[in-house]
Curated annotation (Swiss-Prot):
Disruption phenotype: Loss of biotin synthesis.
Catalytic activity: (8S)-8-amino-7-oxononanoate + S-adenosyl-L-methionine = S-adenosyl-4-methylsulfanyl-2-oxobutanoate + (7R,8S)-7,8-diammoniononanoate
Effect in UniProt of substituting R253K: Increases aminotransferase activity toward SAM
Enzyme class of the recorded protein, top EC level: transferase
Protein name (database record): Adenosylmethionine-8-amino-7-oxononanoate aminotransferase
Assembly and interaction partners: Homodimer.
Note in the entry: Catalysis proceeds by a classical ping-pong bi-bi reaction mechanism.
Signal sequence range: none
Family membership noted in the UniProt record: Belongs to the class-III pyridoxal-phosphate-dependent aminotransferase family. BioA subfamily.
Gene name for this UniProt entry: bioA
CDD domains: OAT_like (cd00610)
Effect ascribed to mutating Y144F: Severely reduces the aminotransferase activity
Compartments reported by the entry: Cytoplasm
Length: 429
């Protein structure tokens, strides 16, 4: 990769959440293997991000590569309208078998945000088919559900990266963010705000949509499982649908295959993505119950009104099948448990740093919340110099490594975080 390539990149290519007039530096990756990203100058960085929660098996995994190479020789893509194929059938069979009952109807889509859009459309069309004008969603403050318009409408309008769009989006209902922590005691008072909104708007609400146990990009907050039990009970009592957005938490990240399992509940609609293909291809899935699917199908339209061009892409489905086969081997449970123990031990010293507000760990997620926002460019440069890839944002320095990470690799990540929080120059004050 030449200097001209990098200059073109900075001049013409938009990166996620980056300015075109003052772009953040980018680091040229030429290959990746295991838990390492290899830069064009030969430096190897231990990946602490799993490419945003996705590459749970690491990079260049032989099983994933073999599945995709085999599939591409047969067909890389074919439309899903009026056509089906073995990779999609196998994938949906696996998903129905592994997700909480009674989820049994699967809609395949392109990305996590689209999976959320699909879930919201399902909820709205469900109530339309029942002849009820329910058009609002109830969710938490500090939540994040994606970057498309519907998904943005259920992200916190005041405390998220989408606050710019407040006033342009449908006005949904936002309960106070959960305060009862995953590692703490349940506080009954936590439910008051949620219960009040439900009581006041029960006849308007199409669905409750939440990120189970872990609020992701909205703050990396980990809350008590009792919340899920209470919400499930309230939704059942009121006849309101429950959507679980497990785009980030699904497939083992929290120590359970799905975060809903921490409370032993099942949603009416479940959104999956990110790790679905082991981080190799873009693919998502939205699952729902037979009752929801048949109600929609028996409505005025006679079908669910959605159909992406690349729905059920065979190449992505083949990758997903291989990824799920790796998970089915069972090794991930011990891997995630070992990562959790190491993260708890090795991030504990960060609690004593003046710039640190909180440290929290669950499964293969380690979060250091700081008292001041990070200086992204300076801190990113420091991490690269330390031989690690960590992408902080706001007041969060967090780790979500591939499950296959070696103890010595994880130690490099935690050591870099501990060194970073001791240096006040990495923070905006």
């Amino acid at each position: 990769m030449t200097t001209d390539d990098l200059a073109f990149d900075q001049r013409h290519i938009w990166h996620p959440y980056t300015s075109m007039t003052s772009p953040l530096p980018v680091y040229p990756v030429v290959s990746a293997e295991g838990c390492e990203l290899i830069l064009s100058d030969g430096r190897r960085l231990v990946d602490g991000m799993s490419s945003w929660w996705a590459a749970i098996h690491g990079y260049n995994h032989p099983q994933l590569n073999a599945a995709m190479k085999s599939q591409i020789d047969a067909m890389s893509h074919v439309m899903f309208g009026g056509i089906t194929h073995a990779p999609a059938i196998e994938l949906c069979r696996k998903l129905v078998a592994m997700t909480p009952q009674p989820l049994e109807c699967v809609f395949l889509a392109d990305s996590g945000s689209v999976a959320v859009e699909v879930a919201m459309k399902m909820a709205l069309q469900y109530w339309q088919a029942k002849g009820e004008a329910r058009q609002r969603f109830l969710t938490f403050r500090n939540g994040y559900h994606g970057d498309t318009f519907g998904a943005m409408s259920v992200c916190d309008p005041d405390n998220s990266m989408h606050s710019l769009w407040k006033g342009y989006l449908p006005e949904n209902l936002f309960a106070p963010a959960p305060q009862s922590r995953m590692d703490g005691e349940w506080d009954e008072r936590d439910m008051v705000g949620f219960a009040r909104l439900m009581a006041a708007h029960r006849h308007e609400i199409a669905a409750v949509i939440i990120e189970p146990i872990v609020q992701g990009a909205g703050g990396m907050r980990m809350y008590h499982p009792e919340w899920l039990k209470r919400i499930r009970k309230i939704c059942d009592r009121e006849g309101i649908l429950l959507i679980a957005d497990e785009i980030a938490t699904g497939f083992g990240r929290t120590g359970k295959l799905f975060a809903c399992e921490h409370a032993e509940i099942a949603p009416d609609i479940l959104c999956l993505g990110k790790a679905l293909t082991g981080g190799t291809m873009t693919l998502s899935a939205t699952l729902t119950t037979r009752e929801v699917a048949e109600t929609i199908s028996n409505g005025e339209a006679g079908c669910f009104m959605h159909g992406p061009t690349f729905m059920g892409n065979p190449l992505a489905c083949a990758a997903a099948n291989a990824s799920l086969a790796i998970l089915e081997s069972g090794d991930w449970q011990q891997q995630v448990a070992d990562i959790e123990v190491q993260l708890r031990e090795q991030l504990a010293p960060a609690r004593d740093a003046e710039m640190v507000a909180d440290v929290r760990v669950l499964g293969a997620i380690g979060v250091v919340e700081t008292t001041h926002p990070v200086n992204m460019a300076a801190l990113q440069k420091f991490f690269v110099e330390q031989g690690v890839w960590i992408r902080p944002f706001g007041k969060l320095i967090y780790l979500m490594p591939p499950y296959i990470i070696l103890p010595q690799q994880l130690q490099r990540l935690t050591a870099a975080v501990n060194r970073a929080v001791q240096d006040e120059t990495f923070f905006c004050q």
